[in-house]
């Protein structure tokens, strides 16, 4: 797949690097914006640089928009698009209808991801669903999830927030392992990362089971696991997580 990039921001750069590491790399045509990033990306195979935004659009029907929301109006004024163009927009918080009006008559798909997109095996989220786009990113080794409504898509961005929240907990747990066992911090982090990977495998391979059911299946009565689950539940360990998630979801609905 040949994909033009209008504005090589941090997330667009991460996506390009990740895809180019995969077994199914794309061909990319970059706008010259963000000269330092573009120069570094040119060292990768399959990367070319066009003279300007319009030159990118002239060469590619599929275009990745990687600029900040406040830069979209300026970008839209710099290119003439056709109904054959398909824009994939990474700009957060901008509704599909607004994007469609700004980039008419092109087709528009919203996309979000975390910085982990620099590595195949991470996920990208789409709205609305697009079969061709999903197939291309799946072939490149990414998990792809699409949503029925724009609110659900906006909420998917909070899963990226949860990643950061979890990483803070990993730090605290890893430091405890270091203090109590003499384990080196990288070893402790790797141990906890593998545990999280195993949890993800269980959730993916056994979708018929709830997370709580899986936890209790592992934590049979009398085990350390069960003691930990009971302690965390008694102290409502999930409460601050649920509170902030509810607060952010409420703000999303208002916006």
Write out the residue ranges for each language-model feature.
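NAD(P)+-binding Rossmann beta1-loop-alpha1 motif at the extreme N-terminus of oxidoreductases
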Residues: 1-51, 55-59, 178-181
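Small-residue helix-packing motif on alpha-helices
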Residues: 28, 38, 56, 72, ...
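Short, hydrophobic beta-strand segments that form beta-sheet elements in well-ordered domains
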Residues: 28-32, 65, 87-90, 124-128
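Short, polar loop motifs at secondary-structure junctions
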Residues: 32-37, 93-95, 129-132
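Rossmann-fold NAD(P) dinucleotide-binding segment
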Residues: 48, 52-103
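Internal alpha-helical scaffold of NAD(P)-dependent oxidoreductase catalytic cores
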Residues: 98-107, 122-206, 247-255
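NAD(P)-dependent Rossmann-like dehydrogenase/reductase catalytic/cofactor-binding core
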Residues: 193, 197-255
């Amino acid at each position: 797949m040949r994909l033009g990039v209008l504005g090589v921001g941090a997330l667009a750069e991460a996506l390009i690097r990740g895809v180019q590491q995969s077994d199914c790399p794309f061909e990319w045509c970059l706008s010259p914006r963000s000269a330092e990033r573009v120069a570094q990306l040119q060292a990768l195979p399959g990367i070319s640089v066009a003279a300007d935004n319009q030159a990118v659009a002239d060469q590619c029907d599929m275009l990745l928009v990687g600029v900040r929301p406040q830069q979209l109006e300026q970008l839209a004024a710099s290119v003439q698009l056709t109904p054959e163009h398909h824009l994939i927009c990474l700009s957060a918080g901008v509704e599909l209808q607004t994007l469609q009006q700004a980039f008419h008559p092109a087709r528009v798909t919203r996309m979000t991801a975390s910085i982990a997109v620099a590595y195949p095996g991470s996920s990208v989220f789409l709205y609305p669903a697009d079969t061709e786009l999903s197939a291309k990113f799946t072939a490149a080794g990414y998990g792809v999830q699409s949503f029925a409504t724009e609110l659900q898509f906006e909420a998917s961005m909070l899963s990226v927030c949860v990643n950061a929240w979890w990483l803070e907990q990993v730090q605290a747990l890893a430091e405890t392992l270091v203090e109590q066992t003499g384990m080196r911090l990288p070893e402790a982090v790797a141990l906890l990362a593998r545990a999280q990977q195993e949890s993800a495998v269980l959730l993916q391979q056994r979708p018929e089971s709830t997370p709580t059911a899986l936890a209790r299946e592992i934590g049979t009565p009398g085990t350390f696991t069960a003691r930990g689950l009971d302690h965390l539940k008694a102290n409502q360990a999930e409460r601050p997580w649920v509170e902030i998630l509810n607060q952010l979801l409420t703000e999303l609905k208002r916006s």
